[in-house]
């Protein structure tokens, strides 16, 4: 199958602003705000523990979105939120890879422990391989990036282990790596074209700037995953009309 970049980009918009897509925007957004608040709390605790001259840490305002909890609680919260983000990522991939408009019970219960474990390991492995490729030369890094683009999708959608997912992603990308690179670059450039103006329009470090950038980044993350899963469906020949999986009877109606 040949990847159609335009179709992936437009379908990504449609899926992002569907009922399920907007639900994921909300879930990702809430999780990101919780994570930012936990990290800001850790930063405040770290700065407070430093032996700095009086007034050295004083600023025009306190750290935005920090929590009135201890550093230990904030650290635990950050880890829990990261795990929750990974789980939401898995459910999103399953819903969009099946081309569903609703979130079914099966998408968030099916072998979730196994899939989460392999997803985390895959993120580390793919990240390291891509980083090594970029350190050696830029081209090998890009080659690895597009070749392993669907590893996380195979793990979430097909319940595969890390090695099988890497192998299948490599095979699926074969023959379409240039098109996949173009797709990644378009999304990457679009991401910065939309988010970069916020640095000029809103006060740096303000709560408003933090909220606006987090909301925008959340929408763009969901869009990116929608585009990748659409490309996955295209290359697997699952993008034909009526080819998507029908919602099962246990649909949650979200």
Region spans (language model):
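Hydrophobic alpha-helical membrane segments
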Residues: 1-163, 167, 171, 175-254
